[in-house]
């Protein structure tokens, strides 16, 4: 399990620095199943989780929602039958902050 899971998201300001390009590979190694994607020129973290039923997918989505409230950092979530797509990025800075990697690692830890 990644050390990121043990960390807490910090309050993010509009002038907070984005994750630097040279930091990205090391952070991605800690969440190996997450894919960096770019949409609307914004770098984000994305992962699809698969489940055997809609109710399992909803249960997982609710766990993410609870964690997101506790961390005060919220993802985009697409819920479908047997599938939950989670995308993390920091709106205030229009890109990736360390909080996104912490939240991605915590999301992985909820999928038990």
Language-model features: where?
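Long, contiguous binding/interaction regions
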Residues: 1-34, 38-112
């Amino acid at each position: 399990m990644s050390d990121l899971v043990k960390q807490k998201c910090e309050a993010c300001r509009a002038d907070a620095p984005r994750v630097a390009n040279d930091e990205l590979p090391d952070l991605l190694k800690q969440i190996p199943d997450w894919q960096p994607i770019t949409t609307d020129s914004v770098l984000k973290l994305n992962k699809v989780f698969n489940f055997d039923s809609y109710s399992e997918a909803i249960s997982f989505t609710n766990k993410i929602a609870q964690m997101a409230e506790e961390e005060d950092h919220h993802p985009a979530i697409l819920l479908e039958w047997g599938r939950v797509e989670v995308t993390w990025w920091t709106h205030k800075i229009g890109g990736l902050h360390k909080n996104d990697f912490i939240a991605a690692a915590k999301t992985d830890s909820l999928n038990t």
